[in-house]
A protein has these predicted regions:
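Glycine-rich phosphate-binding loops of nucleotide-dependent enzymes
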Residues: 2-255
Length: 255
């Protein structure tokens, strides 16, 4: 495992046909952080992640460790250790859990080599299976997994790729309470030696597991800090309640 590196964003700006979607964002996510990114619809959360992962053009700077990410294509950014999930898990559903992990870990190997049944499971794949809690499901088709298990498998696929910066888009959407708790515990383990950023709207989940929170509004950073600090921020209250109340924001924040 490579040493964890932090994400440093400075003056990030994304413009679509004259519309400023991300407006000069500065953001620091330290190694080992489990950062939650929240904000109303149109706040710029997903667009910011799109810029970091090379899906949209942006100006400014986004550095992961010593590497500048802006201006690189998606595949080069991935090879620098940046991994991403979307709201719908991207799996090979007809293949087994083990085969999905094998393919994810198999850059540079032929498809036949990746799909053949072997006597021993590689150490990195075995470790990922244990981390995501799917060791006993390794030989079942990924399409038969429960919703939460599919999300865990996708995270496992990033782990075997040695992703050191994980950008996760609403990982607990549609999960049961038990799945959400297990996912929160999984993210805590993953973040122990990686940098993890979670786009989320579920405030109960955020309260339970976020280490730090960044609130975006209209493409800018509105507030940042612990969950308690963000909820008590008058600026956040103004955006979500229409006025500052002096009481913490308790309602669910839309993604």
């Amino acid at each position: 495992m490579s040493e964890a590196a932090g994400l440093c964003i400075r003056g990030l700006r994304v413009v679509f046909d004259g519309f400023v979607a991300v407006d000069g964002v500065d953001l620091d996510v330290a190694p080992g952080d489990l950062r939650f990114l929240i904000g109303p619809n149109g706040a710029g959360k997903t667009t910011l992640v799109d810029a970091v992962t090379g899906l949209v053009k942006a100006t400014g700077s986004a550095r992961f460790g010593e590497q500048e990410l802006l201006g690189r294509d998606v595949h080069r950014i991935a090879r620098l250790g940046v991994g991403r999930t979307f709201q719908t898990a991207a799996l090979f559903e007809e293949l087994t859990v083990l085969q999905n992990l094998d393919i994810a870990a198999g850059a540079g190997r032929s498809p036949w080599t990746m799909l053949r049944r072997r006597g021993a499971v590689p150490d990195d794949v075995a470790q990922a299976l244990e981390t995501i809690g799917l060791t006993d499901r390794r030989d079942v088709p990924a399409g038969t997994l429960a919703h939460g298990q599919k999300q865990w498998l996708e995270i496992g696929m990033l782990l075997v790729q040695n992703a050191r910066l994980l950008l996760l888009d609403e990982p607990v959407a549609g999960m049961s309470h038990e799945e959400r708790e297990a996912t929160g515990e999984l993210l805590g383990k993953v973040a122990s030696d990686r940098t993890v950023v979670v786009i989320e709207h579920d405030m109960d989940f955020l309260r339970r597991f976020a280490r730090t929170v960044t609130v975006l509004h209209a493409g800018k950073v509105l507030s940042e800090g612990t969950v308690a600090q963000v909820q008590a921020d008058p600026k956040v209250q103004e955006v979500y309640l229409g006025h500052a109340t002096g009481e913490p924001v308790a309602q669910e924040v839309e993604a």
